[in-house]
Amino acid sequence: MGQKVNPIGLRLGINRNWESRWFPAKERTADFIAEDYKIRKFLKKELFYAGVSNIIIERTAKKLRINIITARPGIIIGKKGADIEKLKTTLVKMLGKDVAINIKEEKRPQASGQLAAENVATQLERRVAFRRAMKKVIQGALKSGAKGIKISVSGRLGGAEMARTEWYLEGRVPLHTLRAKIDYGFAEAQTTYGIIGIKVWIFKGEVLAKGIQPEPAEEKKGGRRPSRKRGE
């Protein structure tokens, strides 16, 4: 049974950068990791409806800078910047240090792996059929310029007695090609039948040196793996 490594971690230093950017003293490393987790958990919960695709944390000797990439920057900023100031005050009180917040707009939200996974999760929680939810997100990603997308859902799909995994694939998603720019996202849907896990891989093209042409490859359409029961 094949296991998938996280495609973002696999490409760190090749075509992806770290989401926590700091160099602490050895004894402070664990504290900073725990603090970063606390910040991300708080912001994802507080700004869920703003469509936050990524949170990048940078630290200097005296300052903490949080870069929030979002599909709806206006919701976070608020009228005349009132909401972002309120958010900053809450973070300063929670962390006990000076915090700077930068808001960046997600140019193509439908081609973001994290937002696509959260979109499917939201639809499943609203009792939309899982196949319909997956196909809708796939169509949106391809219209936004993605070259390929794969979505996997696992759990008691449709209220079935046995948990299973199903996935759809459109276009190309070359997970073994390190120069491929793969965006990955994971989300969980809290349904009445239990938790359903959603994973999304989106292929946005290849990062190549100047003068090098990508090799032509055939596109797959409508790929779908038959359902598989857990434990087989």
UniProtKB/Swiss-Prot annotation:
Residues 39-107 form the KH type-2 domain. GO terms for biological process: translation. One of its GO terms (cellular component) is cytosolic small ribosomal subunit. Residues 222-232 have a biased composition (Basic residues). One of its GO terms (molecular function) is structural constituent of ribosome. The keyword Ribosomal protein applies. Signal peptide: none annotated. SMART domains: KH. Keywords: Ribonucleoprotein, Ribosomal protein, RNA-binding, rRNA-binding. Residues 213-232 are annotated as: Disordered. PROSITE patterns: KH_TYPE_2, RIBOSOMAL_S3. It comes from the Bacteria. SUPFAM superfamilies: Prokaryotic type KH domain (KH-domain type II), Ribosomal protein S3 C-terminal domain. The keyword RNA-binding applies. Belongs to the universal ribosomal protein uS3 family. Part of the 30S ribosomal subunit. Forms a tight complex with proteins S10 and S14. NCBIfam families: rpsC_bact. Binds the lower part of the 30S subunit head. Binds mRNA in the 70S ribosome, positioning it for translation. This is Small ribosomal subunit protein uS3. The gene is rpsC.
